[in-house]
Amino acid sequence: MSDAFKPLLAKLADGQTLDEDDAEQFFAACLRGEPTPAQVAAAVTAMRLRGETVGEITACARAMRRAAIHLDHPYEVIDVCGTGGDGLHTLNISTAVGFVAAGGGLKVAKHGNRAITSKSGTADVLAALGVNIDASLAQQRHALDTAGICFLFAQAHHGAMKHVSPIRQQLGFRTIFNLLGPLTNPAGAKRQVVGVSAHRFVEPVAKALGALGAERAWSVHGAGMDELTTTGETEVAEWRDGSLRLFTITPEAVGLPRAALADITGGDPAYNAAALTALLDGQKGAYRDIVMLNAAAAFLVADRVETLREGVELAGAVLDDGRAKAALAGLVAATNSETVPAQVTPA
């Protein structure tokens, strides 16, 4: 069976790109464990050295979406997440943003995983906060219904990735796999804010989101960070209504002070959970500012506000009046509930 992939590998070795059909079929085969580990490693390394195309990223994400376990729901959900891999070890920003967004009235399907290169991934800090990260589909839906936010544990929804996970770990460098998490939300989010770890991915990821059916999405990179940042300038590629727009954002433009990276540097899950709890309890400072900026982007992408500055103001209000804290409490309760309403059924 593995001989069937040799022509495709030869094409990649010659520096050629794969069309979407070939890329999707190959990646689907990877998710079934058909190519050998050496063949998978060769393919993704060749793409990395040449530079992954929008078509290849889109096709691989499409194959991964098809293999996923999906969460059924009636809502227009939003996801805020990053590719990871920026190496800055910040506090959990997009996780905190999820609670602010939910507190502000959005339905948030937060897709995430345990830490790979950081000290504390979304799953790690949520577990430290008391969330059942292994919640069933019914519990996830119950959380979305009642708290406005659910957590979709990537390793549970994308079980087919078990075939390539050891290869990723053995390679030890970024490949196309690192881009796919934010592009494969199991709840089918069509509104997204996606942070990327390097400038070169800003535009391709936005285009891939558009090709995958996003209605409105931002792909962002902020001064080395896979978030909108208050430490400098953020590059944004916005996909909206079938077209792409590129622009930059500074914290000063939306009324926020500039911060030093040291002010938002995190630690282990317990440390980051304590910081997130303090944030939801009303603590002011650089962590609050960067969370408000990213939450503002979520509100804007979801058409909840008309300007980013208005989004910052809404985020501050949600933190101050306890709505964000209530969203966390609701997520903890729903994911640990042993009795889920009968009308909530898995997809």
Swiss-Prot record:
InterPro entries: Anthranilate_Pribosyl_Tfrase, Glycosyl_Trfase_fam3, Glycosyl_Trfase_fam3_N_dom, Glycosyl_Trfase_fam3_N_dom_sf, Nuc_phospho_transferase
Cofactor: how bound: Binds 2 magnesium ions per monomer.
EC number annotated for this UniProt entry: 2.4.2.18
Claim: Thylakoid is one of the keywords in the record: no
Residue numbers binding 5-phospho-alpha-D-ribose 1-diphosphate: 82, 85-86, 90, 92-95, 110-118, 122
GO molecular function terms attached to this record: anthranilate phosphoribosyltransferase activity; magnesium ion binding
Chain segments annotated as transmembrane: none
Co-factor(s): Mg(2+)
Residues annotated for anthranilate 2 binding in this entry: 168
GO biological process: L-tryptophan biosynthetic process
Ligand binding (Mg(2+) 1): 94, 227
Subunit-structure text: Homodimer.
Identification of the protein by name: Anthranilate phosphoribosyltransferase
Origin species: Caulobacter sp. (strain K31)
